From Swiss-Prot:
It comes from Methylorubrum extorquens (strain CM4 / NCIMB 13688). Its EC number is 2.7.1.130. This is Tetraacyldisaccharide 4'-kinase. Transfers the gamma-phosphate of ATP to the 4'-position of a tetraacyldisaccharide 1-phosphate intermediate (termed DS-1-P) to form tetraacyldisaccharide 1,4'-bis-phosphate (lipid IVA). InterPro entries: LpxK, P-loop_NTPase. Belongs to the LpxK family.
Length: 327
């Protein structure tokens, strides 16, 4: 799904005003659901969520938190509902056996770093995490899902976008009214720069919540300077990917933005290959897109690999250590 343009316009936009009554109902129901008590998991849960629909950087945040938890002596497993996959689970994701159409693209990436469980039913998934040897469960997304009690919830915000027009879906990108989501959050992860994100940071700090500023950095050793590329992506903000490539010196001769979580088909690959051949350029995409490509295409596409780097990692470590002390 591509976010409608009016989501980033003022809330007085005609379409936003037209859909606002529906948004009040949807947002209110979601907020009521968030307030319900959850089942007690076998081990503590760290939830990595966001206030809005769409991408904000949750997957790289979850991967960074796995690394930090291991540094603290914990054994994390990741729990995902497997958005975009047809298997309900609970199951342990195996990148060598599963495809994105079965378990979703994000779990395939997460499984490269730690045991990853896909489960529509989160309590069942949490039990499988424990059976896999975990002593802390990192839940990718799920801030609005009340089925499990969470020990700590961090909301990820894209600094360049913030909350858009600040209205609940479908009038805007919010999953529920912001005022009713704040009580469920213990900290903010602000990814990237921008005035929308700084406004969110100011509100979080006014509520006494820590703000962990971070940015996505390319993997060391990647050399994109002067490289002619056809860049394509089906993520929440493909333009952000294109801008990153340009900042690294790549010469983008063509851009192709697909909807978020787009399931690439042979026809897509044929069109992309023809475009690259015509332009005398290499194809490049994101890690999340790469796992959704047809098998025969993966070796022919360059991948921009990124990781999340925190401005003050010590502060985040302290929050994690307090929430998940070693026994």
């Amino acid at each position: 799904m591509r976010p409608p343009g009016f989501w980033t316009r003022p809330p007085t936009h005609p379409l936003a005003r037209l859909l606002a009554p529906v948004g009040r109902v949807y947002g209110g129901l979601t907020a009521d659901r968030m307030d319900r008590p959850g089942a007690e998991p076998p081990y503590p849960v760290l939830c990595v969520g966001n206030f809005t629909l769409g991408g904000a950087g949750k997957t790289p945040t979850a991967l960074a938190l796995v690394r930090l938890l291991r540094d603290l002596g914990r054994t994390p497993a990741l729990l995902s509902r497997g958005y975009g996959g047809r298997l309900a689970g609970p199951l342990v994701v195996d990148p060598a056996r599963h495809a994105a159409a079965e378990v979703g693209d994000e779990p395939l990436l997460l499984a490269q770093a730690a045991p990853t469980i896909v489960a529509r039913d989160r309590p069942s998934g949490a039990r499988l995490c424990a059976a896999s040897g975990a002593d802390v469960i990192v839940m990718d997304d799920g801030l609005q899902n009340p089925s499990l009690t969470k020990s700590l919830s961090l909301a990820v915000v894209d600094g360049g976008v913030g909350l858009g027009n600040g209205l609940p879906f479908p009038a805007g990108p919010l999953r529920a009214p912001l005022a009713r989501q704040w009580p469920h959050v213990a900290g903010l992860v602000l990814v990237g720069e921008g005035s929308p994100g700084e406004a969110m940071a100011a509100e979080a700090e006014s509520r006494g919540l820590p703000v962990h500023r971070a940015r996505l950095v390319p993997e060391a050793g990647s050399d994109w300077a002067g490289r002619r590329v056809v860049a394509f992506a089906g993520i929440g903000r493909p333009q952000k990917f294109f801008e990153t490539l340009r900042s690294l010196g790549a010469e983008i001769v063509a851009e192709w933005a697909f909807p978020d979580h787009h399931p690439y088909r042979p026809g897509d690959w044929t069109a992309l290959s023809a475009l690259a051949a015509r332009e005398g350029a290499s194809l490049v995409t994101t890690e999340k897109d790469a796992v959704r490509l047809p098998a025969e295409a993966r070796t022919a596409v360059a991948v921009l690999r990124v990781a999340l780097a925190f401005a003050d990692e010590t502060r985040l470590r302290q929050q994690l250590a307090a929430a998940f002390p070693r026994a």
